[in-house]
């Protein structure tokens, strides 16, 4: 059995009180927080609870002050401004969204002037990307691929204007930021083999002991340790290699995995470890020691708050819950077909879909499948309190994913004792073994449609069965 991050919750000791640890924030910088972001939040919380000083390695930096302004201000004032800029970028991804919208303006019928204006905007955006890329490469070679970054302390986060924002609730657990501009772009360039070596982060001047990457990266470190450098890479899955529609290019992702395997590494499931070792033709040594199971994503405070909420978004029937960003590999179309083919809706049940629906072909197909079916509730994005309420009140949870590195929503449901219907994947089997006390955990073969329909029909009798027990 692997190690669970939940072990830290019950620890009264502080064995990491002398350690200063940097954690990559690449997933927390994204506009949409997905599974890896929740793993990162759990890791931050666990390390902090065990006494470590935690710093986020970020590509964000201060942008309101130019060098001349900084020279005329005190160091503390500059750090205060830069820290506020970094916090704002973590809190508000709207700038990124606005740029995307600008790029889409040319899709609409417009007059000639507007079309020309949009073409100029697109040209400017693309030119800026190219200029930034060239500048990053130039800077990389000027520094010989070695970066120190700036250590920016975050003190009294509770007294900042950003405290209380759900998106950054993890910031109360960190001590500050390590800001290295374009560090993840450089790592990406190395994974595509456009750079002759991986960017190296020198942790010695920052007095940091360890770097943990929350996903495989082409990156190296230098520390005060006698070893060549302490970097622990957390590896989730092989999905970009096994699923063609994944946005990551398989060559770049393969190289990221290859580079990560050269350092110390851990996996979030035994299934992921075995598959990745097989693909990279590596032997799986220390199988049990190299697995760290994630925490459930449901926050205890949010669960307590949600338990006091009587109703949500007009939901007034029993429902089956699906919780995930709507992506092809999550197989929501399969679940909708099962729901519509079963008799459970005739017995007063709805299907609630909680997760962002993207403006792509798959998202549009899902909307078309549901547009004439009032029994299917497409809730789109839900906040953490809403998500907690949906799990607390769900009659059952369903996850028909085609491929998963782990499956945190399945863990969330099973941990609360919610009946689970999940695709029979190796990672889902591991979750079933972790929550053996949940006797209503069903693993179903995706090729057996009749079995899925039958299990859906049986859900309506679940309450009666539980009462008999």
Regions found by a protein language model. Name each.
Residues 2-469:
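Carbohydrate transferase catalytic cores enriched for Leloir-type hexosyltransferases
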């Amino acid at each position: 059995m692997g190690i669970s991050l939940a072990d830290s919750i019950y620890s009264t000791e502080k064995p990491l009180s002398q350690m200063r640890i940097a954690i990559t924030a690449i997933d927390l910088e994204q506009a949409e927080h997905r599974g890896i972001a929740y793993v990162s939040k759990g890791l931050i919380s666990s390390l902090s609870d065990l006494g470590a000083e935690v710093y986020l390695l970020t590509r964000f930096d201060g942008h309101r002050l130019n060098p001349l302004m900084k020279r005329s201000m005190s160091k503390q004032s500059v750090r205060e401004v830069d820290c506020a800029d970094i916090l704002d970028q973590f809190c508000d991804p709207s700038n990124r969204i606005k740029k995307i919208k600008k790029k889409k303006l040319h899709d609409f019928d417009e007059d000639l002037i507007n079309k020309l204006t949009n073409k100029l905007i697109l040209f400017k955006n693309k030119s800026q990307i190219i200029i930034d890329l060239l500048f990053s490469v130039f800077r990389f070679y000027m520094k010989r691929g070695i970066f120190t970054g700036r250590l920016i302390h975050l003190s009294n986060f509770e007294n900042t204007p950003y405290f209380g924002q759900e998106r950054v609730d993890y910031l109360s657990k960190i001590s500050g930021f390590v800001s290295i501009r374009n560090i993840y772009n450089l790592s990406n360039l190395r994974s595509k083999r456009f750079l002759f070596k991986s960017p190296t982060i020198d942790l010695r001047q920052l007095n940091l002991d360890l770097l943990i990457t929350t996903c495989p990266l082409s990156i190296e470190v230098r520390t005060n340790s006698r070893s060549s450098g302490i970097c622990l890479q957390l590896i989730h899955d092989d999905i970009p290699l096994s699923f063609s529609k994944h946005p990551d290019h398989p060559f770049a992702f393969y190289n990221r995995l290859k580079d990560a395997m050269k350092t110390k590494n851990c996996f979030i499931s035994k299934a992921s470890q075995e598959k990745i070792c097989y693909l990279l033709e590596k032997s799986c040594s220390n199988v049990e020691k190299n697995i760290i199971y994630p925490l459930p994503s449901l926050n205890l405070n949010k669960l307590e708050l949600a338990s006091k909420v009587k109703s949500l978004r007009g939901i007034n029937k029993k429902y089956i819950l699906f919780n995930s960003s709507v992506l092809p590999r999550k197989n929501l179309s399969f679940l909708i077909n099962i729901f519509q083919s079963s008799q459970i809706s005739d017995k007063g049940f709805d299907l609630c879909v909680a997760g962002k629906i993207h403006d792509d072909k798959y998202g549009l197909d899902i909307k078309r499948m549901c547009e004439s079916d009032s029994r299917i509730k497409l809730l789109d994005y839900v906040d953490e309190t809403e998500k907690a309420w949906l799990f607390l009140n769900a009659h059952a949870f369903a996850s028909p994913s085609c491929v998963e590195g782990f499956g945190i929503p399945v863990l969330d449901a099973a941990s609360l004792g919610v009946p689970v219907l999940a695709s029979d994947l190796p990672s889902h089997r591991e979750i079933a073994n972790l929550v053996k006390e949940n006797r209503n955990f069903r693993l179903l073969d995706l090729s057996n449609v009749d079995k899925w329909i039958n299990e859906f029909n049986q859900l309506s009798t679940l309450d009666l069965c539980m009462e008999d027990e």
